[in-house]
A protein has these predicted regions:
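Short helix/turn-capping signatures at newly exposed starts of structured segments
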Residues: 1-130
């Protein structure tokens, strides 16, 4: 799990973890002292929290081992552009959106690219990719 850079191809993969692929040994992927079960959401997901460069991030697997996504707070790259710290106008340009509007949770849900952008002080604080 330790990496300096998370390379995301929307709807397909992040680094070598493919969305919707089943990893029967997914707990081995997290086999490190700083990856701990964060929560179990009913019978749907196992969520693991791991620390990377002093920042907590989350990874999700469905109970059958299917990779369901991640929430990352640092070093998330899309086409060699680090998304963390970008403002909403920059996100519109990067992804070709005409308009994006923050919801009441200071987030933007972009179903077409399977991402939720979480903002704080008008800058991306984290991104959930699924």
């Amino acid at each position: 799990m330790k990496t300096k850079k998370w390379n995301w191809i929307s709807t397909i993969k992040i680094n070598e973890l493919y969305f919707d692929k089943i990893y029967l040994d997914y707990k081995k992927i997290l086999d490190e002292p700083n990856a701990n079960i964060f929560s179990e959401n009913e019978d749907i997901y196992d969520s693991f929290i791991f620390e990377e460069n002093g920042i907590n991030s989350l990874i999700y697997f469905e109970k059958n081992g299917q990779f369901a996504g991640m929430e990352l707070k640092n070093n998330l790259f899309y086409k060699d552009i680090n998304l963390i710290g970008k403002d909403i106008e920059e996100i519109k340009k990067i992804f070709g959106y005409d308009s994006l509007v923050l919801d009441k949770y200071d987030s933007v849900d972009c179903d077409d690219i399977r991402a939720i952008f979480w903002f704080e002080n008008n800058k991306i604080e984290s991104v959930t990719v699924y």
